[in-house]
Amino acid sequence: MTIAPMLTEETPANVLVARVLEEAGIEMVFGISGGHTGRIVSGLSQYQNQVRTVLVREESLGGVMAEVYGRLTRRPGVLLGQGPWVLGNGLLGTIEAHLS
């Protein structure tokens, strides 16, 4: 069995993340740009015509936006964040959206 490489040239990881989101049909990403996520947002800037990035002030707001976007459009809502903050605060936004 032969395995063909997926990439023909060296590509930065942040651009690869953006490419995967674009190829998956993701149209919107909600989150905070800072720390390591700033690099992903930078990669998403190359796909700004395909993937819209909405920056929020805190993870819980991004969680609510991603949840509501998913419910209204029946497409995946993506929350971008890092570390335990996105897990804790982002999940609060999802819970809040479910209880609304």
Outline where the language-model segments fall.
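N-terminal alpha/beta PP-like core and its mobile active-site loop of ThDP/TPP-dependent enzymes
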Residues: M1-S100
